[in-house]
Amino acid sequence: MTNIALLQSLGLFDARVPRYTSYPAAPVFSGAVGADFQAQAIEALDPAVPISVYVHVPFCERLCWFCACRTQGTQTLAPVEAYVGTLLQELELVKQHLPAGVKAGRLHWGGGTPTILSPELIHKLAQAIKAVIPFAEDYEFSVEIDPMMVDEPKIRALSEEGMNRASIGIQDFTDIVQNAIGREQPFENTKACVETLRRYGVHSLNTDLVYGLPHQNRESLAATIDKVLSLRPDRVAIFGYAHVPWMAKRQKLIDETVLPPDIERHELANLAARLFTEGGFERIGIDHFALPDDSMAVAARSRKLRRNFQGYTDDTCPTLLGIGASSISKFEQGYLQNTAATAAYIKSIEEGRLPGYRGHRMTEEDYLHGRAIEMIMCDFFLDLPALRARFGEPAETMVPRIAEAAEKFTPFVTVDADGSMSIAKEGRALARMIARLFDAYETPEARYSQAS
């Protein structure tokens, strides 16, 4: 039996499982955990330990059909200006609970399209954030950039405010693919954007691609990757397209009949992995690549890689503070998501209330299962002695789960003499399915994307 046939027999192309960018996954969050928890968690922060800050800008001038992110379209700047004003109000509410001296080791603007902001709004928002949570000495400020919605004045403003890493969404450069997903983005515009970023001193660059898109094939993806390599990014993520039109209504505009079949989709992922590794990148986890001297590659080699809502990260900050509609915070005590609908989020802020509306209070069992899953997703290795050292006797509950994984996913999963579990290189596409065996929560499969 070929490797791909064996993976298919194990259910790789049928399973729908979490991406495990958090544990527990967001569908487990409950309305029983809200703004009071949010306030208490902020008040408990240690000023000596830098935090990460995520700011969500949900607006886009165009809504790409493939996207399942929390976004909304606008053709004018008026709602964006009003929203930035609300972000500033939220920062003031956070400030009321924030211990003096807390600093940001990481700041990330995501969306949506953060570069829909005018230069004036960029300055206004960045300065308001830094007034409440100043940068730590060795900070990273990254921004998601749409090359079709950015110009030199915006890049200059971001650079002046301290942006030192840019994340550029690409998806695919092929015309027929772009037309099929409602996204126009010529390579020439992207190249010009990258050149401008570097001219303004932004030398750390991430690019995001997607495989499994309509009309995508080996030739078109290879051509896209060749162009991406010419841009010389430090990191690349290539995510599998999640076709969930029952959740993301705009995906109904995509013709399902021209989506690549399961096996071809898997081969596209393998092709991308081969081309990027041949291009000098190291493979990171299930869907990221980084140059050998990049901090993410260094973290992966030393088993210090972590998962967060952006995917893989080398961020060592234990706290993620989410600002903006639908943003999610991660505290030592658990997770908290802000109100998702922009209008409801604004109403909460205008009433002087923190906007947290659902979350999850972590238990010691959650920490154990979460760390086991993170090891699987990041290292393809579950270090049982390390779990025993950290969690003590409860770590023994992992033993039957390890045995189940080894039995169910033979020959890709093996158990070492000390009880640790390893996933073979040929079976790493199964990582999310294997991680599911260590998930203590049952949630409907329809909420998740295809495992491959």
Swiss-Prot record:
Query: PROSITE patterns of this UniProt entry?
Result: RADICAL_SAM
Positions bound to S-adenosyl-L-methionine 2: F66, G112, T113, Q171, R183, D208
Location in or out of the cell: Cytoplasm
Keywords from the UniProt entry: 4Fe-4S, Bacteriochlorophyll biosynthesis, Chlorophyll biosynthesis, Cytoplasm, Iron, Iron-sulfur, Metal-binding, Oxidoreductase, Porphyrin biosynthesis, S-adenosyl-L-methionine
Q: Which residues form the Radical SAM core domain?
A: 45-278
Cellular component (GO) terms are:
cytoplasm
- GO BP terms: bacteriochlorophyll biosynthetic process; protoporphyrinogen IX biosynthetic process
Name the cofactor(s). [4Fe-4S] cluster
What does the note accompanying the cofactor annotation read? Binds 1 [4Fe-4S] cluster. The cluster is coordinated with 3 cysteines and an exchangeable S-adenosyl-L-methionine.
Please give the catalytic activity noted in the UniProt record.
Answer: coproporphyrinogen III + 2 S-adenosyl-L-methionine = protoporphyrinogen IX + 2 5'-deoxyadenosine + 2 L-methionine + 2 CO2
The GO molecular function terms of this record are: 4 iron, 4 sulfur cluster binding; coproporphyrinogen dehydrogenase activity; coproporphyrinogen oxidase activity; metal ion binding
Residues the record lists as binding [4Fe-4S] cluster: C60, C64, C67
Q: Which Pfam families does this one have?
A: Radical_SAM (PF04055)
Task performed by this protein = Anaerobic transformation of coproporphyrinogen III into protoporphyrinogen IX. Dedicated to bacteriochlorophyll biosynthesis.
Q: Which family does it belong to?
A: Belongs to the anaerobic coproporphyrinogen-III oxidase family.
Query: What name is this protein filed under?
Result: Coproporphyrinogen III oxidase, anaerobic 1
Gene symbol here is: hemN
